[in-house]
Amino acid sequence: EQLAEVIAVAYRSKWRILPCGNGSKLKWGSLSKHIDVVVSTQRLNKIINHAVGDLTLTVEAGVKFADIQATLAKHNQILALNPTTPDLATIGGIIATGDTGSLRQRYGSVRDQLLGVTFVRADGQIARAGGRVVKNVAGYDLMKLFTGSYGTLSVITEATFRLYPMQSTSGTAMLTGSKEAISQAADTIRGSALTPTQADLLSAQLVSSMGLGKGLGLIVRFESIPESVKEQLNQVLQVGEKLGLTGVQYFDTEEQNLWRLLPEQIHLPEQESEITCKIGVLPNAAVEVLDRAELGLINISSGLGILRFEDEKKVLEMRNLCELRSGFLSILSAPIEVKQKLDVWGYSGNGLELMRGIKKQFDSENILSPGRFVGGI
C-alpha cells in the first residue's frame, strides 16, 4: 500500500519512476530518460505462502532468488529458474527482465512458471492477475505480458510460481571438439529421447577459459534417479565418441562449481568496456554463430544465448549474422557511450505499434521506466 501511495503521488505529479529490486540489472535495456524517482522493492521481502502439497509459492517482489531456493530446499523443492547473479536477483527483477538461463531446456521460461501477480498500476491502483493454483483460468494472462517488459507497464509487488520437486541425482557430460562434430552431436541429442535439464553450446574461448578442453563445447546436464542419469550420460558420451569428440563427466561438487562458474564467466566481465548481449537464432544456426563469437553460450533447443564482446564493431557484425539467420541480438550491459550510440534492441519485429498501444493503455503518462524498452517505450 505504501508503494501504491508513492506511485499515485508520482502519477499526479508526473514524476518519472524507475522501479528496481536490488539494482543488479539496472544496466540492462535502453537508457531510461529523465528519471525523477528510483523506487526499490527491497523491503518487500516476505514469503507469503508456500503450498508444499500444491507445489506453488507466493512471494513479495523484493525477495532474493537465493533466499527462495534455500527455503524450498528444506522441502526438497525448487523454483526452476537460473537467473544471473542469483545471490542478488529479486523475483520482481527476474520477472521484469525475463531472466533465466538454460533451465528453460526442461522447465520453460519465467512466464511459463508464473501463475499470478499483484501489481501497482501507473496511477497507483493495486491490481491482480492470475491466481495461486496451477490450473488457473481466471482473467487475462497479464503474467506473460509483464514478463520481460522491463518495468514499463506496472510495478510488480507479489508473484506466484509453480514449483518442481528436487531431483535426487545430477550429472553432467561435456563434449569438446570440432564445430562440425559438435553440430552433429547437438542435432542428435535434440532429436533423441534424452531429457536433459540443461543443454548448451559453448564457444571455443569459453571452453578454453574454463579449462574444459579445446574447440567448441556441448554441455548436457541430467537430473533424475541415479540409473536414469547414468544411462543418459553414457548415451551422450557414446554420441561424442562416434563423432571423435572428447567426453568428460562431472558429478557432485565439481559439477555444481561448473554450472556456477559458467554464467559468471559471461556476466562478470573483466573490463567495464566489454559488452554483454542476448541473442536468439534458429537452433541449427547456433554453432555457426558461436564459431564466430568470442565468449558465449547458446541453448541447443531454444537458440537463445548470451555473448560477450570487446568492441561495438563486433556486436554489429554479430547482429547482422543473427538477423540473417532469422534471429536477433539485443545489448544487455555496455558502457553508457555505447548505448547512446547503438540501438540496444535492434530489429523490433512487426509488433512495435501494438506494443506502443499496450504501453499507452497501461501507462498513458509514460511515467514507468520511460525509454527503457524497445522502440523507446
Predicted feature residues:
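N-terminal glycine-rich flavin-associated loop
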Residues: E1-I17, I35, S40-D87, D99-R132, ...
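Conserved glycine-rich FAD pyrophosphate-binding loop
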Residues: W15, N22, G29-D36, T41-Q42, ...
